[in-house]
Amino acid sequence: MNVLIVYYSMYGHIHRMAEAVAEGVREVPGAEAVLRRVPETLSPDVLEKMGAVEPQKAFAHIPVATVDELASADAIIFGTPTRFGNMCGQMRQFLDATGGLWVKGSLVGKAAGVFTSSATQHGGQESTILTFHTFLLHQGMVIVGLPYAFAGQTRIDEITGGSPYGASTIAGGQGERLPSENDLAGARFQGRYVAQIAAKLNG
């Protein structure tokens, strides 16, 4: 069973979460996690000014996703940073190229989930995932979130990401906060849970 993890990461926070999601997927017998990043849309000059060139070298080895790969996956988990309460433009552009899959119904019935990151605690994580769900519903996919069976999302002893809608992390205003162990545990849980649901859907 092929679980595709498609994401965009500018400074590495979503990449680290994607790795944790993949770890969770691989805990399910017979499940294979495949990491892919969506194409970059910003110019090298802009990335340089944003301080993103060096951080992105850490995951430059991850192959760039193609739309056709979505159709061949048994389940898909998407990762995007929050941009003003919505998914990032790179992910939006990638998804906008899936019209052919929609016409064919290629994604109908596939399990799907979303994880995200934001600079602040209340920086739009939930709205980002919920608006992403609109795309999944239009494609006929089966949405899988992060249930409260993952108790880590109810912790109040530390700043933490995660909601019933999906795993998440808080990066800090300057990207100085890396995903905590609790954030990563939520990502692993969601990866494992999506793979488990996909296995049931695929019989």
Curated annotation (Swiss-Prot):
Cofactor binding, note field: Binds 1 FMN per monomer.
Pfam families: FMN_red
PANTHER family in the record: FLAVODOXIN-RELATED PROTEIN WRBA-RELATED, FLAVOPROTEIN-LIKE PROTEIN YCP4-RELATED
Protein residues bound to FMN: 9-14, 82-84, 117-123, 138
Residues that bind substrate: 102
Name listed for the protein in its UniProt record: NAD(P)H dehydrogenase (quinone)
PROSITE patterns assigned to the protein according to its UniProt record, in alphabetical order: FLAVODOXIN_LIKE (PS50902)
Cofactors, names only: FMN
Domain Flavodoxin-like: 3-194
Residues involved in NAD(+) binding: 11
InterPro entries xrefs: Flavodoxin/NO_synth, Flavoprotein-like_sf, Flavoprotein_WrbA-like, FMN_Rdtase-like_dom, NQO
Enzyme's top EC category: oxidoreductase
Species of the source: Geobacter sulfurreducens (strain ATCC 51573 / DSM 12127 / PCA)
Entry annotated with the keyword Oxidoreductase: yes
Annotated EC: 1.6.5.2
Gene3D superfamilies linked: 3.40.50.360
Family: Belongs to the WrbA family.
Superkingdom of source: Bacteria
